Regions:
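Eukaryote-skewed repeat-based solenoidal scaffolds used as protein-protein interaction platforms
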Residues: 1-195, 201
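Alpha-helical oligomerization segments
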Residues: 171, 178-269
Length: 269
């Protein structure tokens, strides 16, 4: 059953089928190399993140997203340079890292999260929200007092939520979703992508808000109505949800042969 509020099921079905073909090619390419470049692991992680968001939007059962989530986190851990200093954030895209870790929390990818957390700790990456979420699977993980981007009002609201009692935290997340999340300043290039041609739109899911709700065991009934809140990813598939294959079906030939629209990222057509 379609979960997205801005595009129809056909859009996501075709987009995920195309992306599946691309990801299969990337995986085969990685396996064929004795020592792939770290950027190649990033490309795979980026594509898997896009797939998870679009597949969730389409209505694919949550349980079928666990395997690609683990694969995404493992690939991302391999893209981090072990000898680099990431104390200032390095070259990692913060919003993407926070979203991936949030997916891992929601989909219970414990071992993959622990592995990524160890890699981030080794390179000196320190951020309050990232560490707060990683402590869900590794309670002794160091929790720094500050955000990497303390001037960001949306991130400050999330931090405020984590320091509040449960009732206040739920209200903080409600305010975040309704006033701070879907803004051009917060989403940047992803803002308004549902109006653009091609398949740039992945879904506007705030995985971080649901992950915080899970870690804090919040009553999120009030958040369920937000078009940005991935309720099912936290609570699981509704009763009666049919089984789905772990991987989506391959794209039909007609999709493989269509001319590509101008790309925003490597996996967009």
């Amino acid at each position: 059953m379609l979960r997205d509020h801005f595009k129809d099921e056909q859009y996501f079905r075709e987009a995920t089928a195309r992306l599946k073909v691309t990801l299969d090619g990337k995986k085969k390419d990685l396996l064929s190399k004795a020592q792939p470049y770290r950027m190649e692991y990033y490309v795979l992680a980026d594509g898997l993140s896009a797939y998870i968001s679009m597949a969730y939007s389409q209505g694919i059962p949550v349980r079928s997203l666990v395997a690609p989530c683990k694969e995404m986190l493992d690939a991302y851990a391999h893209c981090v340079e072990p000898d680099a200093d990431y104390s200032d954030g390095g070259g990692l895209i913060y919003s993407q890292l926070l979203s991936m870790i949030s997916m891992g929390v929601l989909l219970d990818a414990k071992e993959a999260l622990q592995g990524l957390g160890s890699v981030l700790a080794d390179v000196g990456y320190k951020d309050y929200l990232v560490s707060f979420l990683l402590r869900y699977v590794q309670p002794t993980y160091e929790l720094p007092g500050e955000l990497l981007w303390p001037e960001d009002p949306a991130l400050e609201k999330l931090k405020e939520a984590t320091k509040s009692n449960k009732a206040e935290a739920a209200e903080d997340l409600y305010e975040y979703l309704h006033k701070l999340y879907y803004t051009r300043d917060n989403l940047e290039d992803d803002y308004g992508t549902h109006k653009k041609p091609g398949n740039a739109y992945l879904g506007y899911w705030s995985f971080e808000s649901a992950a915080i709700a899970k870690v804090m065991n919040l009553d999120d009934a009030k958040l369920k109505g937000s078009p940005y809140y991935p309720y099912d990813m936290l609570h699981g598939d509704p009763p009666g949800t049919p089984e789905a294959p772990v991987e989506p079906p391959p794209a039909p030939d007609s999709l493989r042969e269509e001319p590509a629209a101008p790309k925003k990222k490597w996996w967009q057509f």
